[in-house]
Amino acid sequence: MLKTEKILHLKARGRSVRAVREHYLREDVRCGSALCLTCPRDGKLLSEDLTHYVVPDCQILQDYLEVLEFPELRGIIIMQTACQSVQHQRGRRQYKRLCSLLRDTRHDCILFSNEFQNHAYLPREMGESALAWQTRCIYNSCVWYYQHCQKKIPVVMVTEDKSVIRQYNTETQEVYVVSFQIYLETFWPNLKGALELYKSLKETHRERELESREGNGKEYPEHLPLEILEAGIKSGRYQQGVLSVNKHRAQLEGFVRLQGLGGKETDIQSDILIYGTKPRNRAIHGDLVAVELLSRSEWKGRNGALCENETDEKAVDAQAEVMPTGRVVGILQRNWRDYVATFPAKEDIETQGKNAQRVLVMPWDYRIPKIRISTQQAEALQDYRVVVRIDSWESTSLYPNGHFVRVLGRTGNLEAEIATILVENSISVNPFSEAQLAEMPSNTPESPWQVKPEEGDRLDLRKTHLVFSIDPKGCEDVDDALSIRKLPSGHLELGVHIADVTHFVPPNTYTDIEARSRATTYYLADRRYDMLPLILSADLCSLLGGVDRYAVSVIWEMDSSTYEIRRVWYGRTIIRSSYKLSYEVAQQLMDGDLEPLNTEMELHPLKQDPVRLEQLLWAVGKLTEVAHATRMRRDMSGALELEGVEVRVQLGEKHSIDDLVPKQPLQMHETIAECMILANHWVAKKIWECYPQHALLRLHPPARQEFFQELKECAKARGFSIDTRSNKALADSLDQANDPSDPLVNQLLRMMATQAMSNARYFSTGSYTEDEFYHYGLALEKYTHFTSPIRRYADIVVHRLLLAAVNKGPKDNLLGNKDLEELCRHINVRNRAAQHCQKQSTELFQCMFFKDKDPDSDQRCISDAVIYGIRTNGVLLFLPRYGIKGAAYLKNIDGLVLACKDNGRCHWMPGSLQRLPDRIVVTTQEAKSFSYCLFDHVTVRIHVQSSRFHPDSIRLEIIRNRPHSSQEALPSASNPQLARSELVKEVTRTAVEAQLAVEGAEELKPVEHYQEYRQTQGQSLYSMLEELWDLALLDVSGA
């Protein structure tokens, strides 16, 4: 043990305080090397097949952590000394990032507690600087580590300090001290991305040092210190919340939604407007900020006018009501991430020096300001999407400083645009690693998978129950199956059987860690990125017909007439599904149509077996009755039926799209959805009963009443009244808001109700009161996700909780409340990212479809539209043919208004607009008036507004104030999914052909073994109903 004493003089003539510091040293500190024969081999170990170990010093770890995050860099030893320097000098954000890297088993790096090892640690000498001591201590630890491993493997210490290299490089044989650049060039010559990132970061650090020396005048006020911000929030002087920038007016409008964490009550009941970039004070979209309210005389209103772009200041809403307005005084937590950007044109590039260029790149996301980076590749990458990161934003700079990371691809290329969407949503879709795939079981003709004898304690349903599944056509990822039978007592027994994913994915394995990181399967318009390897998601965890499978089941015994539940059983089972039915086939059987017996191969034997046929028909019919009764109970409690559009993508070979299959509403859809909701509800009750402080549930809070305002106004225009005081009142009033002459009215009202909904989210029960558990949309007191463990990590956690609750699984690996709440936050973020990714990919395909078409001559660019919103200078439209929502201007940039002739044709001419609650009136100079009313049908022309920097966008132009009547050779207006299928199919085929012609077929990367283990491309109707609370229809409007 080392013991040091210091005498601290608190005041010049005050008393002295003696401080004693004890430092304990041990011989048995675990080294973490797989080559070591003496230390324990538990926990994370460095790989055995390494050629060397690399040890970064403090400065490398602080400045180049991003480079060390490359998974290709292996054998990294992080010394405790360097780790603590990051914590003390780089703050909590980077320290947490380092800790995540050390915990991640996918990265070959460990933490060595060198300051507790007796021979590795060196005490600081009198008068020695902290940096010199840290370097000396880390080098001594490298020497000890080399000798501890019996000199089997060399150790390389990397540093940027040339004096350190001169001092230590030749001191110990096989312990090398080199610069980071030399290390990357020598040991990893093929890892070009790491070297480029290193050079970019180095140049950024150099530029930052130059700026600090120059000391330019301040462009923004300094942020207040954290202790002042916290005190101000507690006293009520400042408010805290997350900054949300309006993407349509990114230079003008940002809003801070209060989190209600202040110490005193506030009468602010709405968002706080941050008007302009100066009051935003270097805060970026997503940052947690502290805001000071301005005086009421300085408050402004939210602009409700349509605008041409994010900097259009001419579009002003004179009727806007003022709202609380403030300015940012400090940043509580940054939300910086990777950003996709594009270089400006050559003539706009500012060159500084001979070897580097300081360039303002334009982010893909409108809400992010320009970022200044230093790079030598600006001209070479003119037409490419690149990834950049923000490093700092000093008060002396108009723009944040960042660095170049990597190239995604050429602008406009389909794969590059898809990669852009993934990066913008922080989605990583690397192939599953060898370590993860090595954990997978085998199921080949040579080595078929079989039920293990040790699984004999499972309830075997293979000979006692008629089990069947009902899924979309072609579905191969069957994660749920059903059974229903009559018991000798006269009661009914209903079973929901879910794939037992947790049997194949134990906690903290490589596969489990990867699934936790992804959190969900990501669905794009033309592809899917799985949460689990295909051998599980499409084979061994898929409840296919005629094969044995492990399941986790919920089985109810219920009254045969009232369907009241008498008792319930939970546990692990073995099942063999007898039939794999599609929704359409099940619907035909329920309706008494036996044609599937001739068309479906697996149903052919039933023609000769009337007994088994009768059993199946009875089961399908009875299942529908039970589901209907269950739904009626939820309806009486206020369950909502909202509106959405669902499409299932069918992929063919070479990553092309064959079709998008429309999902026609069937009674069987509701039947299966209701059975899954019932299972989720009962599992939620069970796990909360057993683990009230750390059960994973899903809540859906009521929407804020102001969000329903536009819905109420639209309904009022057609004579309907929408009551939003409760979910029951909302559901009843939506049911009554039917216009027999136009069914789209009710559809649009339900879509608007969907958009007004709050986000459903996962949570740990120990962090909320029981009153907050309620699921507003489903009208259930407790709810969770249990039925889709193949594609949702939350379901895997719930399976582990349930199995532990019924003593069929281990209890020692369950997460406590704090860890579970942190996991829930991660899953919620990933789910939102998945939804945004899906919407943005749909936007991409819509734009690519219309981009090469002449809007003046191509009839596919002409569509019927319905007005569902009124703005100061235009209207909001819904196109049922394509499922698109967008804006159309009634006043252009020249001040002309859109007037109509007697034949309905529209043209621009001088005039004025008057906005009323249910219409907008156009008055020309000739005193002629025309009205555009809510729910009016008009004819629009669709064209694409291209952008070099940002995503392309759909633009709508009203050409007639009457419905579009020419429907020849066009898809049915009542079937927008069919039109979307043609849209995505054509865009993908065009993109693939162009890519083959320009870049060669090697650029295409079809998923291996896709046909062997194909997973369904879309989500079931049940999944859609589950997620409608979070996801509204795509909005491409400028509103």
UniProtKB/Swiss-Prot annotation:
What keywords are assigned to this protein? Answer: Cytoplasm, Exonuclease, Exosome, Hydrolase, Magnesium, Nuclease, RNA-binding
Q: What reaction does this enzyme carry out catalytically?
A: Exonucleolytic cleavage in the 3'- to 5'-direction to yield nucleoside 5'-phosphates
Major place of localization? cytoplasm
Query: Its GO CC terms?
Result: cytoplasmic exosome (RNase complex)
Q: Which cofactor does it need?
A: Mg(2+)
Q: Which residues form the RNB domain?
A: 458-807
Q: Which GO terms describe its molecular function?
A: 3'-5'-RNA exonuclease activity; exoribonuclease II activity; RNA binding
What PROSITE patterns does UniProt report for this protein, alphabetically?
Answer: RIBONUCLEASE_II
Q: What does this protein do?
A: Catalytic component of the RNA exosome complex which has 3'->5' exoribonuclease activity and participates in a multitude of cellular RNA processing and degradation events.
Whom does it interact with, and what assembly results? Component of the RNA exosome complex.
Identification of the protein by name: DIS3-like exonuclease 1
What lineage is on file?
Eukaryota, Metazoa, Chordata, Craniata, Vertebrata
